[in-house]
A protein has these predicted regions:
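Conserved beta-strand-loop-beta-strand hairpin that lines the nucleotide-binding pocket
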Residues: 1-8, 54-156
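Bergerat-fold GHKL ATPase/HATPase_c domain
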Residues: 1-44, 148-156
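Conserved ATP-binding N-box helix of the HATPase_c
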Residues: 36-61
């Protein structure tokens, strides 16, 4: 028996395809049994990763492809978003993620720069490989309601 189903999509690295990926991730997540909030988290994280590719990966060439892989398990969804464009230094970028740093002046808050922060906040696991392009691996586990499982034994 198959442990997981794998779906792979390749789209041009263009802004108009971000919504296609959001809809695809939403549909796949609902089939596994994710709740509404977790589906929204998955959509945001996936669209942030795809948007990063659109804005940063193919600056020199102007054209490229995004590969999106989705592994569907009974209890989790793994997303892989990959490009073959410019890589970056993850450790250096990681020090800059987040809405602000406590030592910064509020007047100097920058616009953008929240993509990696959001991905790490909304997903259960995030790994980035920047060897020959950038590949983002993200995992989200299905949250199961514990009360329903033991509802007959609960008394008030």
């Amino acid at each position: 028996m198959k442990e997981f189903d794998y779906i792979e999509i390749r789209v041009p690295a263009k802004p108009q395809f971000v919504s296609v990926i959001r809809l695809t991730v939403s549909g796949l997540a609902s089939r596994i049994g994710f709740n509404y909030d977790d589906i929204e988290d998955l959509k945001i994280a996936a669209s942030e990763a795809v948007t990063n590719v659109v804005h940063h990966a193919y600056k020199k060439d102007g054209e490229g492809e995004i590969v999106i892989g989705c592994a569907l398990y009974d209890n989790k969804m793994e997303l892989m978003i990959a490009d073959y464009g410019n890589s970056f230094n993850f450790e250096e970028i990681k020090t800059k993620i987040g809405p602000y740093h406590p030592e910064e002046n509020i007047a100097g808050l920058r616009e953008g720069g929240l993509g990696l922060y959001l991905m790490e906040t909304l997903m259960d696991e995030v790994m980035i490989n920047n060897d020959g392009g950038v590949t983002v691996f993200m995992t989200k586990y299905v949250t199961r309601e514990q009360v329903e499982k033991n509802v007959e034994r609960i008394t008030t």
